[in-house]
Amino acid sequence: MAPIRRSSRLAERYDAIESKKRSLKRLEEQIKAEEEQFSDKMKQLEDEIKIKEQVITMFKRKTVRREWMRNSRQATTNINIAQIESLKLQLEEGEKDIAEAEKQAEPTTPQQEAELSETFKQMVRDRMKVKDVDEKLLQQYMKKENVEFEWRSCFICTMEYSRTDKNLHPIILNCGHNLCRSCINKLTGNGIVKCPFDRLDTRVRVTGLPRNLALINL
């Protein structure tokens, strides 16, 4: 009988050891899973902190730039203001001519209609000249003074928007702010993007958020 009892005790010890091994394995798996979850949460927090730091840096840079612009307004005297004023004067005169023609009488003959149409077309051409000159002179000034066009770059990563790189496409949020697709993806959680500027939510549709084609084509 003694050998049987000894064998039974050994079997019980073996079962107890195996049970402890299984418990230890489950505990190790649980610890590993918790470590992975903790690592994921830490990475998410680090990404959020990085984005917040980038936003703070962006706002600081914009504040410094606005102060610089206020202090350097005198530089605009180098722009050929006379050329702009001359074109604007032509535009005003064209508008006055049309207003005067409308006061005198409605066009009753093909010739009068043609004259009025030509006056209107000339006014449109003058307006476009003013617009083109304004834009060209502004670009010259910005280039000369080494001022960046902030709206051409993502406000978070400061990368310039790209037509070819999909990650740098400008994406429009519901609140109207633009960010690159890469930063949008980092900010997206549970299908919702929270704007870092006004904290408004934008739900990501199945087809994705719309691109700002106007910024891409500039």
Curated annotation (Swiss-Prot):
Q: Where are the zinc fingers (RING-type)?
A: 154-199
Q: Which residues form a coiled coil?
A: none
Q: Which Gene3D superfamilies match?
A: Zinc/RING finger domain, C3HC4 (zinc finger)
Task: For this UniProt record, give its keywords in alphabetical order, as a comma-separated list.
Answer: Metal-binding, Zinc, Zinc-finger
SMART domains linked to this entry: RING
Which SUPFAM superfamilies does UniProt cross-reference here? Answer: RING/U-box
A GO molecular-function descriptor: zinc ion binding
Official protein name in the record:
Uncharacterized RING finger protein B0416.4
